[in-house]
Amino acid sequence: MIEVVCNDRLGKKVRVKCNTDDTIGDLKKLIAAQTGTRWNKIVLKKWYTIFKDHVSLGDYEIHDGMNLELYYQ
């Protein structure tokens, strides 16, 4: 079980607990449950890498305590 921190730079910082074998789509659904936005409107980035929904967190090497950028489309 890892904890990922997502910051939208607008004052909202979300901490989500998930597993490394969860997909980015699963992570978006957990974030959407906490923020109240729709999961398909969320874009997760790290620097210039946009994370795709079907790839797992372990494949992207997302570890415990990692910060991700949260954008809305």
UniProtKB/Swiss-Prot annotation:
<dbReference type="InterPro" id="IPR000626">
    <property type="entry name" value="Ubiquitin-like_dom"/>
</dbReference>
<dbReference type="Pfam" id="PF00240">
    <property type="entry name" value="ubiquitin"/>
</dbReference>
<dbReference type="GO" id="GO:0015030">
    <property type="term" value="C:Cajal body"/>
</dbReference>
<dbReference type="GO" id="GO:0031386">
    <property type="term" value="F:protein tag activity"/>
</dbReference>
<dbReference type="GO" id="GO:0000398">
    <property type="term" value="P:mRNA splicing, via spliceosome"/>
</dbReference>
<dbReference type="GO" id="GO:0005654">
    <property type="term" value="C:nucleoplasm"/>
</dbReference>
<dbReference type="GO" id="GO:0005737">
    <property type="term" value="C:cytoplasm"/>
</dbReference>
<comment type="function">
    <text>Ubiquitin-like protein that plays a role in cell proliferation and sister chromatid cohesion by associating with spliceosomal proteins. Participates thereby in pre-mRNA splicing by maintaining spliceosome integrity. Promotes the functional integrity of the Fanconi anemia DNA repair pathway by interacting with FANCI component and subsequently mediating the formation of FANCI homodimers. Also plays a protective role against ER stress-induced apoptosis.</text>
</comment>
<dbReference type="GO" id="GO:1903955">
    <property type="term" value="P:positive regulation of protein targeting to mitochondrion"/>
</dbReference>
<comment type="subunit">
    <text>Interacts with CLK1, CLK3 and CLK4. Interacts with coilin/COIL. Interacts with spliceosome components SART1 and EFTUD2. Interacts with FANCI; this interaction promotes FANCI dimerization.</text>
</comment>
<protein>
    <recommendedName>
        <fullName>Ubiquitin-like protein 5</fullName>
    </recommendedName>
</protein>
<keyword id="KW-0963">Cytoplasm</keyword>
<dbReference type="GO" id="GO:0005634">
    <property type="term" value="C:nucleus"/>
</dbReference>
<keyword id="KW-0539">Nucleus</keyword>
<dbReference type="GO" id="GO:0036211">
    <property type="term" value="P:protein modification process"/>
</dbReference>
<dbReference type="InterPro" id="IPR029071">
    <property type="entry name" value="Ubiquitin-like_domsf"/>
</dbReference>
<keyword id="KW-0833">Ubl conjugation pathway</keyword>
<dbReference type="InterPro" id="IPR039732">
    <property type="entry name" value="Hub1/Ubl5"/>
</dbReference>
<feature type="domain" description="Ubiquitin-like">
    <location>
        <begin position="1"/>
        <end position="73"/>
    </location>
</feature>
